[in-house]
Amino acid sequence: MIPGIKRLTRDFPQVNLAFSLHSPFEKQRSELMPINQTYPLHKVMDALDAHVANTKRRLFLAYIMLGGINDSAEHAKALAHLILSRGALSYLYHVDLIPYNVTDKTARKFIASNNETIKNFSDILHSNRISVATRMQFGSDIGAGCGQLYADERD
């Protein structure tokens, strides 16, 4: 992942980069995304900082809102701190809040955050001057929506 970010920065600086974050906490992110054990968030953030510094392009942080898991005020405040700690270029970080889309193949341990929780999360980011948007839910009826954490296995 980090070598890919560096390669993208070097070879395709005009391309906007989106990074799947889903938790500002290392331990929880490792539980949600095992790749975090190989590429810890703090090291990935260093690579993303270098990308932003070199390209001066907005970087998108995708954040799937999982009810009762990563949608608390504590998570929002930690995410704001993570972005603000980027320093002078923190204004180039943008958060896309993505409502979790449940399908017949997604993990049953996850549920979607409710709209009020998503709004409160967004408001905390806004109050910290973090650029944030909440994505609309499209495509979940056909298994094509953002916010679906699963792999379709075929025989």
What do these predicted ranges mean?
Residues M1-I124, N128:
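Conserved AdoMet/S-adenosylmethionine-binding subsite of the radical SAM
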Residues I98, R135-Q137:
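Conserved beta-strand termini and adjacent loop/short-helix elements that scaffold enzyme active sites
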Residues S127, G139-D155:
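Radical SAM enzyme core and accessory elements
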Residues S131:
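Residue-level detector of anion-binding/catalytic polar loops
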